[in-house]
């Protein structure tokens, strides 16, 4: 059965916009769990623009499901992860000027750095995922680096402007999922997925988990966080029937 990882970053974005203590991403995470989330995803960025260290520290002991911590491949962030010991960590690229993660991690280009991080995290009992574009070379490099999980970047699919372009990107994701599975990897997917485009990705055989945040937080403004999570989970499950 396909799983849903709910990303709570944008609850923290709203909090940080005014420098208040609310809305509380911890509360959002617990509501998401009660609504059917299988994991809670959060990205502790180097610039701390939304999620803060304290959020991660509190959440690590509060979750009943899994914490999936997104992190840049830097000594500071890997060191933090080794101290917190999340269940899962997803290594992602990061640029300070970007609004959101704009593409997959170039594992092939930064192979030694990524491989070293994978080994350090694995030795600490943390399951490592690499957020990569739907490119064969990146999947091959992920296998060589020792990551047991990859998350396919679905942003190009989500941003497609025409039906033909979207279909082409969907086929790229399907091929990447198949290649990952053939290598024995667990394959997740995420980025840019929302209520109108999620089902085609959820229906791909072998996809283990989708990580979705912005769309759920946006929907929650109108229907509440619990319902927003349930609606997304139901769409995913329907697509797999």
Curated annotation (Swiss-Prot):
One of its GO terms (biological process) is pyridoxine biosynthetic process. Keywords: Cytoplasm, Pyridoxine biosynthesis, Transferase. Pathway: Cofactor biosynthesis; pyridoxine 5'-phosphate biosynthesis; pyridoxine 5'-phosphate from D-erythrose 4-phosphate: step 5/5. It is found in: Cytoplasm. It is an enzyme of class 2 (transferase). 3-amino-2-oxopropyl phosphate binds at residues 7, 18, 192, 213-214. It catalyses: 3-amino-2-oxopropyl phosphate + 1-deoxy-D-xylulose 5-phosphate = pyridoxine 5'-phosphate + phosphate + 2 H2O + H(+). The active site is at 43 (proton acceptor), 70 (proton acceptor), 191 (proton donor). One of its GO terms (cellular component) is cytosol. The record marks 151 as: Transition state stabilizer. Its main location: cytoplasm. GO terms for molecular function: pyridoxine 5'-phosphate synthase activity. Homooctamer; tetramer of dimers. PANTHER family: PYRIDOXINE 5'-PHOSPHATE SYNTHASE (PTHR30456:SF0). Belongs to the PNP synthase family. This is Pyridoxine 5'-phosphate synthase. It comes from Nitrosospira multiformis (strain ATCC 25196 / NCIMB 11849 / C 71).
């Amino acid at each position: 059965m396909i799983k849903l990882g709910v990303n709570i970053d944008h609850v923290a974005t709203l909090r940080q916009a005014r420098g208040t203590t609310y809305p509380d991403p911890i509360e959002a995470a617990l509501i998401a769990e009660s609504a059917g989330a299988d994991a809670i995803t959060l990205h502790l960025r180097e610039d701390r623009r939304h999620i803060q260290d304290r959020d991660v520290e509190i959440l690590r002991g509060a979750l009943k499901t899994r914490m999936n911590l997104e992190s840049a491949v830097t000594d500071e962030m890997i060191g933090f992860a080794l101290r917190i010991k999340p269940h899962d960590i997803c290594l992602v690229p990061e640029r300070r000027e970007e609004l959101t993660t704009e593409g997959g991690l170039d594992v092939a280009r930064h192979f030694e750095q990524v491989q070293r991080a994978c080994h350090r995290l694995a030795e600490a009992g943390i399951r490592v995922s690499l957020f990569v574009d739907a490119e064969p070379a990146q999947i091959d490099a992920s296998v060589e680096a020792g990551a047991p999980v990859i998350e396919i970047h679905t942003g190009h699919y989500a941003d497609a402007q025409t039906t033909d372009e979207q279909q082409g990107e969907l086929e790229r994701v399907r091929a990447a999922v198949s290649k990952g599975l053939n290598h024995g990897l667990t394959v997740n997917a995420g980025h840019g997925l929302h209520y109108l485009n999620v089902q085609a990705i959820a229906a791909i055989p072998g996809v283990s988990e989708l990580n979705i945040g912005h769309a759920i937080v946006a929907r929650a403004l109108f229907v509440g966080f619990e319902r927003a999570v349930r609606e997304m989970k139901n769409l995913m499950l329907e697509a797999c029937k």
